């Protein structure tokens, strides 16, 4: 059984995370590098992190970048019958995806589990009975969005003042200010 989950997301002030299958803001290189570093870096030699994403998130990744390198890619879908091209695993639910980590072929290969979207996958992960960290890139302005991050209770989530390898100062790229935040919920 998975002891902890990590969610990583970039959100606008209005809690928007997407528009028509894309990010609603221009690509922010330092945020992209932060996402890569956090989801790829394993704390255990010879293990990889596992990234879980919904079908729409998988197909929003440019084909040349699928699967996300250096990570075990799991796509969640109740509709898909076949594994999407180049994905490593297909699961019907978050529970099924997490059970994969107990299978012999993955049991000794997976370090951390990262939820990378979309909205319904985040919502399911946030109600999962385990410790959870939310790695939030807080975009400090509104953007027009059609997909939103689920509301979360700040009474249950503690904002960590510092976290290893996460910058705490405000960043700015392409006239967009943002900051990295880490929240923790203990089960």
UniProtKB/Swiss-Prot annotation:
Instruction: State its Enzyme Commission number(s).
Output: 1.5.1.3
The encoding gene is DHFR
Please give the pathway this protein is involved in.
Cofactor biosynthesis; tetrahydrofolate biosynthesis; 5,6,7,8-tetrahydrofolate from 7,8-dihydrofolate: step 1/1
Q: What is the lineage of its organism?
A: Viruses, Duplodnaviria, Heunggongvirae, Peploviricota, Herviviricetes
Q: Which PROSITE patterns match?
A: DHFR_1, DHFR_2
Q: Does the keyword NADP apply?
A: yes
Q: Which GO terms describe its biological process?
A: dihydrofolate metabolic process; folic acid metabolic process; one-carbon metabolic process; tetrahydrofolate biosynthetic process
Entry's CDD domains? DHFR
Q: According to the lineage, what is the superkingdom? A: Viruses
Function statement: Key enzyme in folate metabolism. Catalyzes an essential reaction for de novo glycine and purine synthesis, and for DNA precursor synthesis.
Any idea what this protein is called? Viral dihydrofolate reductase
**Domain named DHFR: which ranges?**
4-185
Q: Which reaction does it catalyse?
A: (6S)-5,6,7,8-tetrahydrofolate + NADP(+) = 7,8-dihydrofolate + NADPH + H(+)
Family, similarity comment: Belongs to the dihydrofolate reductase family.
Q: Does the keyword Cell membrane apply?
A: no
A molecular function annotated in GO for this UniProt entry is: dihydrofolate reductase activity
Q: State the organism of origin.
A: Saimiriine herpesvirus 2 (strain 11) (SaHV-2)
Q: Which InterPro entries does the UniProt entry name for this protein?
A: DHFR, DHFR-like_dom_sf, DHFR_CS, DHFR_dom
| Annotated residues for binding of NADP(+) | 10, 16-22, 55-57, 77-79, 117-124
